[in-house]
């Protein structure tokens, strides 16, 4: 079926069920950022493949809302379909809430699958549409009804992550969460975020492409821990190990009937912004629900000493693979055919040569020339183009290792570049270096520091439409909260204090539509600096070990202090990486890290 035919079939279903508007978010049942193939309902109904966006279908309109990262891609993919693009955050573009408020008439019905909408979002919709007396149909998976060849729910094998890698036993983590639960004055903790469950239980899976998580729900009280999963994914030895730590396994879908049996005097702690609305509405009304961020969120984000040391090893391996790849690319571009897709395959080959490599941490972005301006471009057979010995290629890639997760962007010069490309290449790099070198008082958040990265671009009246940085998981999701670098805070994302052990990306960029894109990204770990009469100061230490391309830099634009920062970083890269290279690669790296 084409997108047009699918929308026609959905509208027929809506008519039969008395639903006037149907909301299709990107989410799975766990509020995951990236979702398994079974859950890709929004992609199915609109044809848009980006990782963020929400569709609204009515009898006379179909709309897709997405953010600045995806404006170009969405416009291309929606062409020729009945779906209108709503560019979130742009002037005169209504939010989904505003749109529904204005377009749903009194007494109409809004439908969605309550398992794919958070309790918080469902409550917000109810409040907004209350005065129109809009009613809700939240138990219908209408896309599932029309999707004939829908993939099955994933059930990939589960592995245990040993203490050697995790740095802490699951028993120790469970004790910490039980004590936090007690502090909150609650009896039960309901956890549905997949990466939090994997972190807490020291297990990893493969139920979402590039995200080593296990489809699961978890309920913990002071004596029991119930895990709702597909038991087939667990070997006997993993089940035995979990059982030893007091973890009982139940069927995945049983969570909905289980929560109906929670005794009325109990207090349940959960995160309404994470737990889906069907699950929360299944809890008896007499049960007290305490809402707050997941008790696992901060302990997971603050990496322990073992994790930090392991991550340094992961980044050393990744640096070796990246340096070998960039050397190979520069040597061969123009000599043999290299495309965006074949370059990604070659990089995978270099990473695979590293011990304990587990796979990509996200789909690689190898974006040549004008493709670089599409922030989250992902080459397909249709869009794939050859790399030529001129201009820039933006490469945002990462790997999972038993020692941790990497995420790196390098913009590589393949041949002659324009003055404009050099100007912005240098401005973005200056911002990156300024943020990486920040020293700040304990208590600062990413909001306090973001302008350091944007400063050089802001001075030119320029900017980029994405956050400057995100947290990164340990052999988990490459985008992990709660910390970030951004210049304004959405109400839903409180800005947490930057703590020692947090790993965050530093990735300013610049995008000239239809021309080129530039992004420079390292991961940095937050460390304690000195303590003075003003209190504790903090700093960042780089984890990523790959040179920035000197051929893209105009040293005249840089202040002496910025050149010094770059030279120090490059000397550090050479010292760490060169022992793992052959002679030819070593002499190339020597030149690539020379002082400017």
Feature names for model-found ranges:
Residues 1-596:
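Active-site neighborhoods and metal-handling regions in enzymes and metal-associated proteins
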């Amino acid at each position: 079926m084409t997108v047009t035919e699918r929308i026609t079939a959905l509208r027929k279903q809506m008519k039969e069920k008395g639903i006037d508007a149907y909301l299709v978010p990107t989410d799975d049942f766990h509020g995951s950022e990236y979702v398994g193939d079974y859950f890709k309902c929004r992609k199915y109904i609109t044809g848009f493949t980006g990782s963020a966006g929400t569709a609204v279908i009515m009898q006379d309109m179909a709309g897709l809302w997405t953010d600045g990262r995806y404006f170009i891609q969405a416009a291309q993919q929606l062409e020729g379909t009945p779906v209108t693009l709503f560019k979130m955050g742009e002037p005169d573009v209504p939010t989904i809430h505003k749109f529904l408020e204005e377009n749903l008439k009194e007494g109409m019905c809004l439908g969605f699958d309550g398992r794919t909408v958070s309790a918080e979002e469902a409550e917000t919709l109810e409040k907004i549409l209350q005065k129109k007396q809009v009613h809700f149909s939240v138990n219908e998976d209408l896309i599932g009804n029309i999707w004939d060849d829908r993939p099955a729910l994933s059930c990939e094998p589960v592995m245990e992550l040993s203490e050697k890698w995790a740095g802490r036993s699951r028993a120790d983590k469970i004790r910490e969460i039980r004590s936090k639960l007690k502090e909150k004055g609650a009896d039960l903790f309901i956890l549905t975020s997949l990466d939090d469950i994997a972190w807490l239980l020291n297990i990893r899976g493969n139920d979402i492409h590039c995200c080593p998580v296990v489809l699961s729900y978890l309920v913990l009280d002071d004596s029991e821990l119930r895990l709702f999963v597909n038991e087939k994914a667990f070997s006997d030895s993993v089940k035995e190990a979990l059982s030893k730590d007091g973890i009982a396994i139940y069927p995945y879908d049983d969570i909905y009937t289980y929560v109906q049996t929670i005794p009325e005097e109990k207090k349940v702690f959960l995160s309404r912004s994470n737990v889906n609305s069907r699950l929360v509405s299944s809890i008896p009304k007499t049960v007290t629900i305490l809402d707050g961020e997941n008790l696992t969120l901060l302990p997971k984000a603050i990496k322990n000493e073992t994790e930090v040391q392991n991550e340094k090893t992961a980044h050393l391996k990744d640096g070796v693979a990246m340096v070998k790849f960039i050397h190979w690319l520069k040597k061969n571009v123009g000599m043999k055919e290299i495309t965006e897709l074949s370059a990604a395959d070659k990089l995978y080959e270099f990473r695979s040569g590293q011990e304990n490599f587990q796979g990509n941490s996200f789909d690689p972005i190898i974006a040549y020339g004008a493709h670089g301006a599409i922030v989250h471009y992902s080459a397909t057979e249709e869009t794939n183009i050859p790399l030529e010995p001129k201009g820039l290629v933006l490469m945002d890639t990462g790997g999972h290792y038993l020692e941790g997760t990497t995420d790196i962007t390098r913009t590589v010069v393949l041949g002659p570049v324009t003055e404009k490309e050099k100007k912005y290449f240098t401005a973005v790099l200056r911002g990156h270096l300024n943020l990486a070198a920040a020293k700040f008082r304990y208590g600062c958040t990413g909001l306090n520091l973001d302008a350091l990265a944007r400063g050089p671009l802001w001075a030119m009246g320029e900017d980029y439409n994405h956050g400057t940085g995100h947290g990164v998981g340990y052999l988990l999701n490459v985008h992990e909260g709660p910390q970030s670098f951004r210049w304004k805070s959405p109400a839903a994302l409180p800005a947490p204090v930057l703590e020692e052990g947090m790993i965050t990306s530093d990735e300013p960029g610049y995008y000239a539509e239809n021309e080129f894109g530039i992004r420079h990204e390292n991961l940095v770990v937050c460390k304690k600096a000195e303590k003075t009469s003003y209190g504790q100061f903090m700093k960042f230490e780089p984890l990523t070990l790959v040179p920035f391309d000197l051929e893209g830099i105009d040293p005249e634009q840089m202040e002496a202090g910025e050149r010094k920062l770059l030279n120090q970083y490059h000397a550090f890269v050479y010292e760490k990486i060169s022992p793992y290279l052959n002679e030819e690669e070593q002499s190339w790296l020597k030149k690539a890290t020379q002082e400017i």
